[in-house]
Amino acid sequence: MIEKLTFGLFKKEDARSFMRLMAYVRPYKIRIVAALIAIFGVAATESYLAAFIAPLINHGFSAPAAPPELSAAAGILSTLQNWREQFTYMVWGTENKIWTVPLFLIILVVIRGICRFTSTYLMTWVSVMTISKIRKDMFAKMLTLSSRYHQETPSGTVLMNMLNLTEQSVSNASDIFTVLTRDTMIVTGLTIVLLYLNWQLSLIVVLMFPLLSLLSRYYRDRLKHVISDSQKSIGTMNNVIAETHQGHRVVKLFNGQAQAANRFDAINRTIVRLSKKITQATAAHSPFSELIASIALAVVIFIALWQSQNGYTTIGEFMAFIVAMLQMYAPIKSLANISIPMQTMFLAADGVCAFLDTPPEQDKGTLAPQRVEGRISFRNVDVEYRSDGIKALDGFNLDIRQGERVALVGRSGSGKSTVVNLLPRFVEPSAGNICIDGIDIADIKLDCLRAQFALVSQDVFLFDDTLFENVRYSRPDAGEAEVLSALQAANLQSLIDASPLGLHQPIGSNGSNLSGGQRQRVAIARAILKDAPILLLDEATSALDNESERLVQQALERLMENRTGIIVAHRLTTIEGADRIIVMDDGKIIEQGTHEQLMSQNGYYTMLRNISNKDAAVRTA
């Protein structure tokens, strides 16, 4: 099918992804059929306007003619011939032609305009709706992807897939479909007119079609990899812009404006270079196609003049032929130039389908416990992030009782955060198993598993919405009284009172209107409202001043009441009251016990505590 539509320029394998996306168009097939009918109207009126010239010159300036003698023979062809003769006489043969001919011309142009508007509107409508559906499915797919995918894939690439490539694949498809159908119909109609007027001259016109097809194929092959590289470069640019925007404080603090500008300039130059190649090919394509068309036109004029001198054609037929041929030039040029946007469309469709085919997060669990008690056990758990054999956790074993507060301490890279990320299955173990209340977490449905946890981390993320909506995110059915209670428990009553909007004050992008301590306490309020049986704290009090830390610590104490808690600590002074402290190094447990027990051993924990005390002394000095 695609070979026929593109005159052999593209093959089935080139359009496999694109044809898959066309499944999104099927619900709108009635509108597409209506658009096709309108496109046919455009092609028919365009063709007839060319044929209009011959009778205008041959009959328009002559005296009124006698009524035609109609055939008495039966049959469809005779009937159609009689209708044509009567219509020609009504328009061109009577003395009323001084107003019927202009009126007929106006009617033709109006019909063409209505058909052109209808086809453009319907195809644009289908394009917009299709893009909306594809983006909806892509966003739904993004929500199913694993945390590892989001960590390893730049945000600019995801944005390019969802915005740029979707637009390129579907919008280009709408334009290309319109060009292919409308201009093919126009060329076909005008070719019929040419054959009707002079079949010998028409053969010369037809001979240029294969030459234009070969020219388009040459530029398609030349630009395939250039267009692909250009799309990838745009994704890289999106990522550079996103990183610079998100990290604007780091850029300013370290005077990294020049470095950021250099990164942007490098990728921008790459895009410019690739765009120049595409533009050069596109610009060179038009003159070559024009040269082929002009040679054909020159030959036609030469032969037509010779035929006219020898009485084989009338002036009206010659003028109509030239007009029809000139009218054919624009659609032929559009068809000849379509290979480049079509190549872009196919490559964009490949990118969209590749994203839609990304494997979702594994969820093979079948169990759906409503609320667990909070007993946790790790059995011989290994975690390998990389393929070089280095393990983040190595034979990790740990049992946590219901309601127990367990703190994980150790140097950076010892595996503390990995333990926390394993429980909601943000990370999958390479070996071993993890159980909650004796149930392997791999056997629990992901949504039910994650409903058992509340997470407060050092990397707080807040939405660009109101305070109320950010807290209620953990429980969308919560009312204002419940949200207010959670905020009060998180020591945020003063924040509510400080704004006339109270609970409904906007907090800015990622809580940019709040202080660090306030952002942390909003995250705690969100966790309090969720009321999950297991609490995960990943360095929740790091990088806070003393007063903010005190308020956050008070909120955390309220949050951890009657819950199993796993606390990743950087400041060891914050976990002295933990029921048990687990000391880790190189993915293994090397010490465990209460604060007093570990200090009495004068081991690794004592060393970490001494280092922490020195750091605290430096901060307060």
Swiss-Prot record:
Alphabetized UniProt keyword annotations: ATP-binding, Cell inner membrane, Cell membrane, Lipid transport, Membrane, Nucleotide-binding, Translocase, Transmembrane, Transmembrane helix, Transport
Domain ABC transporter span(s) in chain numbering: 378-611
InterPro entries with a match to the protein in the record: AAA+_ATPase, ABC1_TM_dom, ABC1_TM_sf, ABC_transporter-like_ATP-bd, ABC_transporter-like_CS, ABC_transpr_lipidA, P-loop_NTPase, Type_1_exporter
Catalysed reactions listed for this entry: ATP + H2O + lipid A-core oligosaccharideSide 1 = ADP + phosphate + lipid A-core oligosaccharideSide 2
GO terms assigned for molecular function: ABC-type oligopeptide transporter activity; ATP binding; ATP hydrolysis activity; ATPase-coupled lipid transmembrane transporter activity
A Pfam family it matches: ABC_tran
Nucleotide-binding found in the keyword field: yes
Cell location: Cell inner membrane
Record PROSITE patterns: ABC_TM1F, ABC_TRANSPORTER_1, ABC_TRANSPORTER_2, MSBA
Residues covered by the ABC transmembrane type-1 domain: 33-344
Enzyme Commission number: 7.5.2.6
Gene Ontology cellular-component annotations: plasma membrane
UniProt main location, coarse: membrane
Residue stretches spanning the membrane: 32-52, 91-111, 192-212, 286-306, 312-332
Matches recorded under PANTHER family: ATP-BINDING CASSETTE SUB-FAMILY B MEMBER 10, MITOCHONDRIAL, ATP-DEPENDENT PERMEASE MDL1, MITOCHONDRIAL
Role played: Involved in lipopolysaccharide (LPS) biosynthesis. Translocates lipid A-core from the inner to the outer leaflet of the inner membrane. Transmembrane domains (TMD) form a pore in the inner membrane and the ATP-binding domain (NBD) is responsible for energy generation.
Free-text domain note: In MsbA the ATP-binding domain (NBD) and the transmembrane domain (TMD) are fused.
Family: Belongs to the ABC transporter superfamily. Lipid exporter (TC 3.A.1.106) family.
Subunit and partners: Homodimer.
Name of this chain's protein: ATP-dependent lipid A-core flippase
Species whose genome carries this gene: Neisseria meningitidis serogroup A / serotype 4A (strain DSM 15465 / Z2491)
Lineage: Bacteria, Pseudomonadati, Pseudomonadota, Betaproteobacteria, Neisseriales
Gene: msbA
